[in-house]
């Protein structure tokens, strides 16, 4: 018997629109609202993580403002994923930003595209699967929406009510708005070529182009964070359901000194008449801190991950070790809150280099410099340290892990 060929699952590209300035949310040192912190992470990170863990998503492009390169790079430090995330600069309007994202995906092997506002972090896979099912069944354009429940009034310019508008067949549109890729790209290109740049969502462009738009049920939680109060409420929502899980790890290391031209401590080279002896660069401070970080999630110690018997680590920069440990912490759901290093040495003097060391720790760990501490003391000429035969380091790391549900 002749069998019909089975349908191929959709291969979805994701366009996340994050180029807006968000004036209604007020100014903040954290930047535009998509970079504000909720539940310990930037808004855009929550949005990205939802898509990165959704199987049909094969390509993700984030449309950002040209001024936000550093903000976006900092946000990405919260994410560990094999899913590639690419960026493209947006335009003056949302419509132009979306077109930039679509053009970036043009040469990718995708069948469909989901276009989503970065500041809608509370969608879920149930909604995404509902959209995918509609696309898989042949819909060219899919709009998640919820029926309007408020009573609607039409008023004149003076604020006088003219009439009550029937709510029947009225819906509030949400994102991700989803389409057959070539169909929406063509519609966007035609809208741009015609001089239209005033569309406020992508379903409107589909309607203008004569493409049927299918509604699927949205979710009440899938709200757009628009004003400052929205962001505060989102933070409360994410934080209230979690119990804090604060962990502290300790690390200790020591390396011998021998004749040389300097030592590397916390990634900073200090000229000296001795050097530290070791398989790698022998940065005793970073080695101790690596162990402290690994201890917070029970991930062994530095020797487990970088055996001194392995020739590939001979002479290696210890930055590799500390960044690896920080990555493991984040993979386990941890946020590094504080890193403290105490160096015990008779020489060289650490004080003149302390700020440079703190800056390096901040860079390696992806945390603010105020969360990085470096201290030093001598051993009062006692023992091997006192005899200038070695340098020791003690490190403490404080990490908050994603809590458990109450």
UniProtKB/Swiss-Prot annotation:
It catalyses: 2-C-methyl-D-erythritol 4-phosphate + CTP + H(+) = 4-CDP-2-C-methyl-D-erythritol + diphosphate; 4-CDP-2-C-methyl-D-erythritol 2-phosphate = 2-C-methyl-D-erythritol 2,4-cyclic diphosphate + CMP. Its EC number is 2.7.7.60, 4.6.1.12. The record marks 167, 224 as: Positions MEP for the nucleophilic attack. It comes from the Bacteria. GO terms for biological process: isopentenyl diphosphate biosynthetic process, methylerythritol 4-phosphate pathway; terpenoid biosynthetic process. Keywords: Isoprene biosynthesis, Lyase, Metal-binding, Multifunctional enzyme, Nucleotidyltransferase, Transferase. Residues 247-406 are annotated as: 2-C-methyl-D-erythritol 2,4-cyclodiphosphate synthase. The record marks 24, 33, 279, 378 as: Transition state stabilizer. Its cofactor is a divalent metal cation. 4-CDP-2-C-methyl-D-erythritol 2-phosphate binds at residues 253-255, 279-280, 301-303, 377-380, 384, 387. A divalent metal cation binds at residues 253, 255, 287. The keyword Lyase applies. One of its GO terms (molecular function) is metal ion binding. PROSITE patterns: ISPD, ISPF. Pathway: Isoprenoid biosynthesis; isopentenyl diphosphate biosynthesis via DXP pathway; isopentenyl diphosphate from 1-deoxy-D-xylulose 5-phosphate: step 2/6; Isoprenoid biosynthesis; isopentenyl diphosphate biosynthesis via DXP pathway; isopentenyl diphosphate from 1-deoxy-D-xylulose 5-phosphate: step 4/6. InterPro entries: IspD (IPR001228), IspD/F (IPR026596), IspD/TarI (IPR034683), ISPD_synthase_CS (IPR018294), MECDP_synthase (IPR003526), MECDP_synthase_CS (IPR020555), MECDP_synthase_sf (IPR036571), Nucleotide-diphossugar_trans (IPR029044). It holds the Pfam family IspD. Residues 1-246 are annotated as: 2-C-methyl-D-erythritol 4-phosphate cytidylyltransferase. In the N-terminal section; belongs to the IspD/TarI cytidylyltransferase family. IspD subfamily. In the C-terminal section; belongs to the IspF family. Bifunctional enzyme that catalyzes the formation of 4-diphosphocytidyl-2-C-methyl-D-erythritol from CTP and 2-C-methyl-D-erythritol 4-phosphate (MEP) (IspD), and catalyzes the conversion of 4-diphosphocytidyl-2-C-methyl-D-erythritol 2-phosphate (CDP-ME2P) to 2-C-methyl-D-erythritol 2,4-cyclodiphosphate (ME-CPP) with a corresponding release of cytidine 5-monophosphate (CMP) (IspF). HAMAP family: IspD, IspDF, IspF. This is Bifunctional enzyme IspD/IspF. It comes from Rhizobium leguminosarum bv. trifolii (strain WSM2304). The gene is ispDF.
